[in-house]
């Protein structure tokens, strides 16, 4: 889902808000959010079909507070608190955290960059997710590019460099990524994230690398989970095209790959954790059409392992076609259809080779 995109807008002060308070000439606090709900029919082969309300068909629902203070001499303090929720039930997206999407404070200077401390998106996730064209629920870029999916790390320090002729670099380190809260540093899962971005008008190019140091690696782990991503997009005005490639090793660095074999870590299948590799490709196209756009996206993830029954793991493919219609700068109607092979909503790779289809429509409102 394109959560990081909207979070970045909010952090930059570009998102419309229902409340914006200026405490004095150099301080501001802003309330912002997204409410997205729709109706969808989902079918998984071998499991049947399900219809009902869909939370976040286009973008996950969230609300947040962000603020800045001018400290003088080019320095500024900033913060962001962001929480996801389900509008179909009114419940929090994460019952264990008040601000699951973000809770950080930082200092920034035009000459020295932006330093942020707290729970936040990694540099790799932020840069990689910007290449996504179609963010449909469970069938966006994150379905195959797990290092660009919607995940955050706790106890993290991120630094983003100043912009220089279109280039920006970022580096991040999480001292306790999944909140194990052990006293000794090496008893906690740590993460490092690096990224380089180039942006010049219609052109965007990114490269990222991330690695996890697990506090307690699973038995027969093939090494530290890591992910490398590279891609670019170009807006030709009549069409926008996005291309990306990713290589993931030894499990998912975002701890967001499910737990089909009971490893208890969200690293994905045991065969992947035990030295497996996944290569993924993505092609996305956006074509303006009236007050909206037609969105087409295809991605493929190719694993290199065999399942316990000796069968070779098959490629997972996700293809979507959708349309967004802007009723106003804040409100968007949308409709989409998606098909995924060898993929379920719970697991990126399915030993049973299940196929998933989804058709949905809804409304997304930003405030």
Regions found by a protein language model. Name each.
Residues 23-42, 51-176, 188, 197-204:
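Outer membrane beta-barrel
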Residues 354-367:
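Outer-membrane beta-barrel "beta-signal"
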Residues 75-77, 113-115, 166-169, 202-207, ...:
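Repeated loop/turn-to-beta-strand initiation elements of outer-membrane beta-barrel proteins
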Residues 1-26:
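Cleavable N-terminal export/targeting peptides
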Residues 35-39, 79-83, 119, 171-175, ...:
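Transmembrane beta-barrel strands of outer-membrane/channel proteins
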Residues 51-61, 98-101, 151-155, 188-192, ...:
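Residues that define the transmembrane beta-barrel architecture of outer-membrane proteins
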Residues 39-47, 85-91, 123-127, 177-181, ...:
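Gram-negative outer-membrane beta-barrel proteins
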Residues 187, 193-320:
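Detector for outer-membrane/organellar transmembrane beta-barrel domains
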